[in-house]
């Protein structure tokens, strides 16, 4: 039976995956296992794509024969490393290359990237990179990677003669269908990243689950957090924009960062104020929510002392802030006008916590 006939069930399965929303790690692992089962001699495979996330520029699934596939993420600053600069993946991205094959042994041996020498030392004999460009996909916003978007898969074999022509044909035939299935999953992941980054986890999930109309929402008991930066108007008027933003982010890292570290959720940055909640379901969880909120407050105060000592040592302006906490039921949902909404909390508990915070100015 031909390779094309052997891999047809895999292609059909990938079409089904594209119509679903599978776990991308499991999908890649299963595809690799099915390819090896029909005789394609892969022993190492990597799936790489760029994402849209405040921390990560790219994600990759790592599969090695006999092991479970795992997901790894690359920070934005990782693209400046020497390893990346000398990577075949960077070459493929920057030169819009769709197929790159390197034989690692024999008369056609080509080791023009450092990783190829490493793979040869590990016993690999053949290396293949397949890239599928996806229009209307995401971009990192990095001008150095403009247009560098799509799905990249690398395959490596340790069979003595490497990949046969039939193997190469099979992998290239599967690539486009697999890229389509990946696009479905990746766009869903990116939507979740964007929703949770700008709305928070709870609000993001609610919106993605269909609560998109004005008035959609829920009632929930919560410990509500409201913090506000002192003298922000004076700082904004007297400081250079870059200096002011640096202070503002240091303050947000101190307050919102502590809130998140203790299980809270940031709902909104209102100018230089932070609005967040520690939700709980019933009275049995109230004490835990209060303890988490108080622990977050303690951490924020400790962090502010550390940051202000460092800022004073470097001649920078120190910052101060107030925090108010309140417990009660809040209305959590969509407010605004039909075509422009904000997912936030409203109610007397929120109004009270803002007034409580303002009282810290008198202390």
Would you name each region that the model predicts?
Residues 8-16, 21-36, 112-116, 168, ...:
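Short amphipathic alpha-helical segments
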Residues 67-129:
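Regulatory sensory and allosteric helical modules in signal-transduction proteins
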Residues 249-263, 284-323, 327, 348-359:
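Alpha-helical scaffold within the catalytic cores of cyclic-nucleotide enzymes
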Residues 134-172:
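Regulatory loop-to-helix N-cap segments in sensory/regulatory domains
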Residues 277-288, 323-343, 359-362:
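Catalytic strand-loop-helix junctions within cyclic-nucleotide turnover domains
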């Amino acid at each position: 039976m031909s390779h094309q006939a052997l891999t047809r069930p895999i292609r059909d399965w990938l079409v089904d995956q594209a119509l679903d929303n599978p776990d991308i790690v499991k999908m890649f692992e299963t595809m690799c296992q099915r390819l090896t089962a029909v005789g394609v001699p892969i022993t190492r495979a990597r799936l790489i794509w760029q994402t849209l996330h405040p921390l990560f520029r790219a994600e990759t699934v790592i599969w090695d024969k006999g092991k479970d596939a795992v997901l790894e993420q690359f920070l934005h600053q990782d693209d400046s490393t020497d390893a990346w600069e000398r990577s075949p993946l960077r070459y493929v991205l920057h030169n819009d290359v769709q197929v790159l094959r390197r034989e690692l042994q024999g008369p056609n041996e080509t080791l023009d990237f450092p990783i190829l020498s490493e793979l040869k030392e590990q016993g690999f004999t053949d290396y293949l990179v397949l890239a599928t460009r996806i229009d209307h996909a995401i971009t990192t916003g990095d001008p150095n990677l403009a247009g560098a978007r799509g799905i990249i898969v690398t395959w490596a074999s340790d069979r003595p003669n490497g990949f046969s022509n039939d193997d190469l044909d099979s992998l290239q035939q599967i690539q486009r269908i697999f890229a389509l299935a990946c696009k479905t999953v990746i766009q869903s992941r990116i939507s979740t990243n964007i929703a949770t980054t700008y709305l928070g986890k709870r609000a993001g999930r609610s919106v993605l689950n269909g609560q998109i109309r004005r008035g959609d929402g829920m009632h929930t008991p919560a410990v509500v957090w409201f913090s506000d930066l002192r003298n922000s108007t004076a700082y904004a008027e007297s400081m250079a924009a870059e200096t002011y933003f640096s202070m503002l982010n240091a303050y947000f890292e101190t307050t919102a960062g502590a809130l998140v570290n203790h299980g809270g959720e940031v709902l909104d940055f209102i100018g230089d104020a932070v609005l967040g909640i520690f939700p709980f379901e019933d009275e049995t969880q109230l004490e835990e929510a209060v303890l988490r909120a108080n622990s977050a407050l303690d951490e924020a105060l400790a962090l502010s002392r550390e940051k202000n000592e460092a800022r004073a040592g470097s001649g920078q302006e120190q910052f101060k802030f107030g925090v108010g906490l309140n417990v009660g039921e809040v209305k959590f949902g969509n407010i605004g006008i039909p075509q422009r909404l904000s997912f936030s909390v409203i109610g007397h508990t929120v109004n009270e916590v803002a007034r409580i915070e303002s009282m810290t100015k008198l202390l």
